[in-house]
Amino acid sequence: MEELKLNIEAIRTQMKLTRLEMAGRLGISVDRYNRLANGESKMLATELVCLHRISGVPYENIDVPEKS
């Protein structure tokens, strides 16, 4: 059975944070967050680690799409 993968927006919504709050927790600008959420930029390994740590979502359940 395939595990459900959550993207950065789904995780933010589950955490009940605004984009500004999520960007702050990730240590990135809101513009950078928006580019990640819209698939315009590829997530860096450091951002993935931070997202995992603040959300508790296992790495393998975080959807990290390639840059379009």
Give, region by region, the residue ranges found by the protein language model.
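Residues within the helices of the helix-turn-helix
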Residues: 9, 20, 49
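Alpha-helical residues within the helix-turn-helix
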Residues: 13, 24, 53
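DNA major-groove recognition helix of helix-turn-helix/homeodomain DNA-binding modules
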Residues: 46-61
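Short amphipathic recognition helices of helix-turn-helix/homeodomain-type DNA-binding modules
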Residues: 61-68
